[in-house]
Regions:
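Charged, glycine-interspersed solvent-exposed loop segments at helix/strand-loop junctions
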Residues: 167, 171-270, 379, 422-503, ...
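Flexible, low-complexity junctional segments that flank or bridge functional domains
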Residues: 2-50, 59, 96, 121-128, ...
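Intrinsic disorder and flexible/low-complexity segments
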Residues: 300-303, 307-343, 463, 534-592
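Active-site proximal loops enriched in glycine and acidic residues that flank catalytic Cys/His/Asp
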Residues: 307-310, 353-355, 383-385, 405-407, ...
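Conserved beta-strand termini and adjacent loop/short-helix elements that scaffold enzyme active sites
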Residues: 132-134, 184, 285, 382, ...
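C-terminal long alpha-helix characteristic of the crotonase
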Residues: 226-227, 258-302, 415, 472-478, ...
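Short glycine/threonine-rich loop-to-helix capping motif typified by GTGT followed
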Residues: 360-365, 499-502, 542-547
Length: 592
């Protein structure tokens, strides 16, 4: 018996030791892979930067430690990483050109315009750009059209079709469950509530949406026309004929592409451009490789570039559905901006905003911190795809506002939308409520028991009215405009940045680089460098987050899986997490 117990204990100790040793070896292997991934990248002569244009592009690249196991790097591309890599490729004499691998790129046009402009600047160095793809989405083609040569697979597709905007309406769907919506708002154009209360677009919403997509399409056609030498009328004709269903040969005749080739043939053509022998290899650098290519000397003063992207909420704990990267949490942002304000090494701040708005209270808090920051050092706002409603609220106090021509901004308005569940709970489910109270409004807002009464709705409307007046006043102060002038361009209306420039909601059309240059000018800096904030999460935090349901990696997987249903899914799922009063973009549309 003693021998049996000894053998069992020895076996258990041995197994325990084995797992410890294997755990240590595994951890060392992971650390080794991460360390090797972060090692400085050597650039060989006759190198080519291979830029993959597929998937989604976020504002900031997020580290995905799972990529070393999954091999999937396309989901974590950051605009900041892409722009930085293009700059490095331009400056490095050993990198001879950029090879664009086009594909199913799902990103809005202001972001694509940033990339396209950077590629156009790259070409000014005398280096070449070649694009190739089996399938070009319209956005991918818009970017790729700046290349010296655009090639396509002999059976490939260019999905050139124009821009359409669709809104989903849930009124009848929710009514089947006995759910209605209590809505109060200020602003004729503040139509975010329509998706819950109407069956189609209002005339005001249709007007502003049509204006937005028409302006964006004009900008796209003008850029492609200039690069490809195709008239705008022809581009519209091609869109009407829906090129995706036309024969590939049609694309060559239409001058949309320069030729039809297979992938290996394009690579041979690139070798000829580089004057390499057929047997010579091309040294290819991916986006991840480029991130580890040494930058130029870091000299001069620091300009901080702070990224704020996603729905506006008050607390990071509110951002529990997916990753915190999809939210602007006011408490964290205010703390970060205060730290930058008090950092004597930071001479100016560029706040990069990409948001359709959100919580009105949170927007007010960030407005205050932006105002305090401006008192100490220049603060320039760079607007991404969206900087509307609550996002414009927080932008208003900036020293200078820069937006891409295709940026959607404005939407100065407030609304509250609250689900009335009383029909579901009492009628459908048969639940009954009774109450006692000390004061008239002690049970205010219990919409599971009953709808708002007239007095309650009037009080909520008064609160929204006060929020709108304050929003309007903040814009007037920040933009140095009379309140009356702000009212004429407010009412919840969204504006394309080209129009926003004319009505003084923005100061300049351009991208992040233009915003940085303006910040340097305002701070009177000759030599400067930029640093990105917030700092990237540690690899351990990133790994744990990637494996959780709140990870950015899984969020992107869900985005690709759900496709067109991702946006309504996230909106409906987040309703119960919202504060009642919102300063949010006036509609949730799917733009294609």
């Amino acid at each position: 018996m003693k021998d049996f117990i000894k053998n069992v204990l020895a076996t258990m100790v041995g197994m325990f030791g084995f797992f410890i040793v294997m755990g240590v070896i595994g951890m060392m292997s992971i650390i080794g892979m991460i360390a090797s991934g972060n090692a400085a990248q050597n650039v060989e002569k006759n190198s080519v930067f291979v830029l993959n244009l597929s998937g989604t592009i976020s504002e900031q690249g997020s580290e995905n430690p799972l990529s070393m196991f999954t091999g999937d790097n396309s989901l974590n591309s950051g605009l900041n990483d892409i722009l930085s890599s293009i700059k490095k490729a331009k400056a490095n004499d050993d990198i001879k050109g950029i090879y664009i691998e086009a594909g199913a790129l799902m990103t809005n046009y202001a972001t694509l315009q940033e990339i396209r402009n950077a590629l156009a600047d790259f070409r000014k160095s005398g280096k070449w750009i070649v694009a190739y793809g089996d399938f070009y989405t319209q956005g991918a083609y818009y970017v790729a059209s700046v290349a010296d040569k655009v090639y396509i697979n002999p059976k490939g597709i260019v999905d050139w079709h124009g821009i359409g905007a669709q809104t989903m309406f849930y009124k009848d769907f929710m009514a089947k469950f006995g759910v209605k919506w209590e809505v109060v708002k200020v602003g004729t154009f503040k139509s975010a509530t329509e998706t819950f209360t109407e069956e189609k677009m209002s005339n005001a919403n249709r007007l502003q949406t049509q204006t937005f997509i028409d302006g964006t399409w004009r900008n796209i056609c003008a850029a492609v026309s200039k690069s490809r030498g195709i008239s705008v009328d022809s581009l519209n004709s091609y869109a009407d004929s829906y090129l995706a269903l036309q024969a590939t040969e049609t694309l060559v005749k239409a001058k949309m592409v320069d030729g039809m080739m297979y992938g290996d043939q394009v690579k041979e053509a690139v070798k000829k451009m580089m004057k390499l022998d057929k047997d010579d290899d091309i040294s290819q650098l991916t986006l991840n490789d480029m991130l580890n290519v040494k930058d130029g000397k870091v000299e001069g003063s620091e300009i901080a570039v702070y990224y704020a992207s996603g729905d506006i909420v008050q607390d990071p704990k509110s951002a529990t559905m997916f990753g915190n990267n999809n939210y602007i949490a006011s408490r964290k942002v205010c703390k970060d901006l205060e730290d930058l304000m008090n950092d004597d090494n930071v001479k100016a701040v560029v706040v990069r905003i990409n948001s359709g708005g959100g919580d009105a209270y949170a927007s007010e808090q960030m407005w205050h911190q932006m105002s305090e920051l401006r008192k100490v050092k220049p603060v320039v706002v760079s607007m991404g795809d969206y900087a509307a409603s609550g996002a414009y609220y927080m932008s208003a106090p900036a020293s200078w506002i820069v937006a891409q021509p295709n940026t959607l901004t404005g939407s100065i308005g407030i609304f509250a939308v609250i689900p009335d569940l009383s029909g579901l709970v009492t009628t459908k489910l048969g639940v009954r409520f009774d109450e006692v109270k000390t004061n008239r409004n002690s049970t205010f807002g219990n919409l599971m028991a009953r709808p708002f009464n007239a007095e309650e709705k009037a009080m909520l409307q008064a609160s929204v009215n006060r929020g709108y007046s304050l929003f309007r006043q903040r814009v007037a102060e920040g933009r140095r405009l009379p309140v009356e002038s702000v009212e004429k361009i407010a009412q919840g209306r969204v504006w394309l940045a080209t129009d926003a420039l004319n009505i003084k909601l923005v100061d300049q059309l351009g991208g992040i680089d233009d915003a940085v240059k303006k910040a340097a000018q305002l701070a009177k800096l000759k030599d400067y460098y930029t640093s990105d904030y917030p700092a990237a999460a540690s690899w351990m935090d990133a790994m744990l987050n990637s494996m959780s349901s709140s990870g950015t990696y899984l969020d992107e997987q869900l985005r690709q899986t759900l496709g067109d249903f991702y946006q309504p899914f996230t909106m409906l799922r987040s309703i119960d997490k919202r504060e009642a009063i919102q300063a949010r973009i006036p509609y949730a549309i799917s733009i294609k």
